[in-house]
């Protein structure tokens, strides 16, 4: 979602053979619908340039002459060095303006808007641990698409919620209109995880006649429409996503500073208001208790962040375009948390079903839009598919090919 984890996926065994099988060189050029790929949380690179008045450790760089990769750079996640990274990647929330700011002397930018490189591999070294949308893009290329032309990427600053990314949506709309003109037809949006929430926000803010003209379809992969309980654990005690060299408490402050985390807390239109997500020796917390939850974890800014973002997407307002929802099932997915010591110790996790990150009932919110829009809404379960692995899954890629090129 957006995944709230480091993106880690590997090429499937026999993946190259599968790509060759999908290749369709006979498909007439120019008749493919253009494609825009939208990543999830932590799903594209970020770059930073420094001119800081001070640093948190003597090993940290105070000034850089050029932009460098802030995410994902595996070298920056090493012990001690990670303190430098946390200090640079965090956001500072302003209670007066209800916006976030970069730390003093840190400038962060999103590289590669319109290209796919920053989301194919999150680590510019192209290490397998940072592979994200590479297999999907390679599949598109094998079907006749060309990077940076009729398949483009729309990366964004995933630390922020849509209300702080206004210029991004203007650039996205302009790019879609340009691709329509260049390639003679409407665009197919393909989003993953939190990128689906971004696209829902975008589409809810476009006139219907614009959507009818410029958007052919919206393919939503692992969509967290109703929010995910995992965010409560991230906010309370941090989440190292099973990376042993990183302590959860070490990165908790940085994870809390990302407003997009509070945006993805569970919503009442999907989850029962009585469902207990967090149990502690002193209190239990449902989605009606967020204000108290933030107070008890010592993060009062979180309540303001939630109030700022809770109404950004309207659950009862469908996207207004042809929609394909693909979601993982059968993978143990965090649903509630028991703390013996709250909030500074890891909890016992209780699991439901989903894709390991997005719970099934959150993804299935797609179903409620049937009958609320004239455009068709299709749902496709992906049994046993994990949140990231689904992006390279043969079923997913075959489904996408049918959407783009037909039977």
UniProtKB/Swiss-Prot annotation:
GO terms for molecular function: acylglycerol O-acyltransferase activity; calcium-independent phospholipase A2 activity; lysophospholipase activity; O-acyltransferase activity; phospholipase A1 activity; zinc ion binding. Substrate binds at residues 41, 194. Disulfide bonds join 60-84. Pfam families: LCAT (PF02450). GO terms for cellular component: extracellular space; lysosome; membrane. Glycans are attached at residues 94, 284, 393. Transacylase activity is completely inhibited by Triton X-100 and partially inhibited by heparin. Moderately activated by Mg(2+) and Ca(2+). GO terms for biological process: ceramide metabolic process; diacylglycerol biosynthetic process; fatty acid metabolic process; glycerophospholipid metabolic process; phosphatidylcholine catabolic process; phosphatidylcholine metabolic process; phosphatidylethanolamine catabolic process; phosphatidylglycerol metabolic process. It is found in: Lysosome; Secreted; Membrane. This is Lysosomal phospholipase A and acyltransferase.
